Amino acid sequence: MSLLVLVALVPLLTAFIVMTGDRKEQERHARTGLLPIVASFLGSLATLIVVTSEGPITVQLYDPAAISNPAVPVGFYIDRLSAVMMVLITGVTTLIYRYSIGYMYQDRGYRRYLGMLALTTSVLLCMVTSANLAMLFLFWQMLSYLLFVLAHNHAHQPTLAGATNTFTLLRLSDAAFLGGIVLAYSLYGTLEFQPLFARAAESPVTLALWPSLGWEIDGVTAVTLLIFGGAMGKSAQFPIHTWLPRSLYAPTPVHALLHAGIINAGGFLLNRLAPLYGLSPATLHTVFVIGTLTAILGATMMLTQNDIKKTLGFSTIGQMGYMIMECGLGAFSLAVFHLIAHGLFKATVFLNCGNVIHKARQEPIFPRTDHDAEESELSTLTWSTGFLTTLLLPLVILLVTHGVLHIPLLESQGTLILLFFIWVTSSQAILSLTHLRAVASWKVSAAMLVTLMLVVFTYLFAVETFTHFLYPDPEEVASYFRAAALPRRLFDSLVVGTTLLTILGWFYLYARAHGRTIRIPGWVETFLQQLYVLFMNRLYLDQLYLKGGRLLLSVAHRLEKRLS
């Protein structure tokens, strides 16, 4: 079994082959270096099969009894979560490496890039198989540095500025992560995952923040909030998400790896510590708020960008917010399912970026005519079909999933919120009918609805199956949903309010499509225009952080002069 751990170290052979070979034969060495990457992928598949059939694998690299008071044992722990992440990492890396052999061939940093890509893969594999928080943090730090090196593959000023910004912001979030680890060890005396979870559950600790005012916080809440600070940085959560758009000057394959693998580290960290987060409803609520805010802001800023890479970057921020929100709802397995699907999709999109840009530059852009606008109007049939579907789709999903798929969707608030997002997404899909020439055809409407139903049910079935695979104990899954439950009045208000907004949106679209005048006060139009500019400029957070940094440097220089 210990041989399976070597899967994480095999990519180091690729780095050695590529970076130590003769420069004149770099393409041949690059192709040879693909073999260890493929071997690592095959080994990851074998590991997944072994872990699924025989259970988790624990490998200690030394005998703890032979060392006096070992604070941090060195070893690896591979369970189903680790094995799934290993397959995702090695699979995506295999495709990116093969693509990079030709794409990056004429780049001056060709060998350096391929070597760092292989080294990053090995570090990612070691991170997801770490046996304790200390080892996980060590590889987490190495990953941050390698991300800086990969983002700075091109030696020119914009790339350096983006890479430095990335390195700085990740250092701040990693400081919070380190604080959480130190606090966890001081409170519970261990950094091993299973003993840590057990001690946190059996021995609740309360910390006094301000004794004179009676301010207190649960120890597990303090630990999980600090560790979540590290996850916020890696997964580009608001307000420390600005490093991701600034790193867009890196090579396209680097973005494929970043958006498909590295940025998922936050979701993996929350899943690895799910039993710990399940003990703190306050932390889960905070995670939910941060994730929801990031998802909304990321999607909104994506719609205002005019650059394809920035659009994809903010799309990733929105998707990472959605993934973190799922963790905040207690749907940890769904977050893993989401990061896998998003990782595969975004890797494909980024690797196809160059081809899309090339075609866009060659194809003429025709102005939109009045005739086109008339054809895209919503017909009465299309609107009524979409509106009724918007109202009836949740009921149909509930009936079918309960009666046929036996998936309980009413037992927790988290699943209801996720159902609401499915509802909104389905409504958006129905709007695609407006882009069809046969927009008034009942056959087209029926085909769209049937396809939509099949997609929704397939998705729910796949998620339920994956949940049972990743967390076989139903009680554990239920405990996470109970811990993440919101106050009843707040939950009901959110559901009713968002439902009314969605329904009003349909009426607004119908009225505009039929030429009805909707009177909007002048101050509202001005506010919307200002809001558009605000989102287009990414909330001016880059400028705000830059001024804040200059202010801190100025204060530091003044203090230095006074003390010297």
How does the language model describe each region?
Residues 1-521, 529-564:
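...captures the hydrophobic TM-helix bundle architecture rather than a specific catalytic motif
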